[in-house]
């Protein structure tokens, strides 16, 4: 939380964060979201109001948390060189953990695809399962993600050169492309001929693509935040840790989607 009190001489370059309610508030909001999602999926709740309310509280708490972090970094000067280095290292560790999580799901998919059992009809996809064509919406989403990589690289180069207007355009276009991707992914789910309960194919397919979709939603929030910060002159060509982590996150998710397209949609279908 933002802390304006400086009653001591700090003899180290690190930021000692003051008490903040947002980690606890976000944790309880995420717990409520998970519970409401599970209860709704299993038919214990007849409407989505509690799930929508939990989603709103998660977004609200994360917005205020980000607001405090931006105030500490931009206006209070708490993010020294050592703090920025630690933030980048922590984000890299987060990216590695995400790659390991996706690797486990790819392992589950390939384990069943390379050795289909009798119960699946000795074939992959299982007998009677109509897979989604790789030449339809998945191909369009792949083109959208590749285009977002181009616009993001354009924004990064503009930011490094101190060109605020082109940086703003690059982040705005990237945000729009990510929103289109999530919309088309939802449309694909709507018209899919199977669900997450349709055996190992449905569960691994929706686990992989759904997890990627959740990360894309988080990326949209990060891109929107970066767009707002560029608009408010918060970034400079030498200090833009938030932009660097967002750019790295987008490229990592792009690579994950390319593997997903080749393995799940093209080869796996």
From Swiss-Prot:
Transmembrane parts of this sequence: 21-41, 49-69, 90-110, 132-152, 167-187, 205-225, 247-267
Q: How does it assemble?
A: Component of the cytochrome c oxidase (complex IV, CIV), a multisubunit enzyme composed of a catalytic core of 3 subunits and several supernumerary subunits. The complex exists as a monomer or a dimer and forms supercomplexes (SCs) in the inner mitochondrial membrane with ubiquinol-cytochrome c oxidoreductase (cytochrome b-c1 complex, complex III, CIII).
Q: Write down the species.
A: Debaryomyces hansenii (strain ATCC 36239 / CBS 767 / BCRC 21394 / JCM 1990 / NBRC 0083 / IGC 2968) (Yeast)
- Report the EC code(s) recorded for this entry: 7.1.1.9
Pfam families (UniProt xref): COX3
Spell out the reaction equation it catalyses: 4 Fe(II)-[cytochrome c] + O2 + 8 H(+)(in) = 4 Fe(III)-[cytochrome c] + 2 H2O + 4 H(+)(out)
Q: What's this protein's name?
A: Cytochrome c oxidase subunit 3
What Gene Ontology molecular function terms does this protein carry? cytochrome-c oxidase activity
Record's family? Answer: Belongs to the cytochrome c oxidase subunit 3 family.
Topology of the protein relative to the lipid bilayer: Multi-pass membrane protein
Function of the protein: Component of the cytochrome c oxidase, the last enzyme in the mitochondrial electron transport chain which drives oxidative phosphorylation. The respiratory chain contains 3 multisubunit complexes succinate dehydrogenase (complex II, CII), ubiquinol-cytochrome c oxidoreductase (cytochrome b-c1 complex, complex III, CIII) and cytochrome c oxidase (complex IV, CIV), that cooperate to transfer electrons derived from NADH and succinate to molecular oxygen, creating an electrochemical gradient over the inner membrane that drives transmembrane transport and the ATP synthase.
Catalytic EC class: translocase
Do you know which CDD domains this protein is assigned to?
Cyt_c_Oxidase_III
- Going by the entry's taxonomy, the superkingdom of the source organism is recorded as Eukaryota
**Is Disulfide bond there in the keyword field?**
no
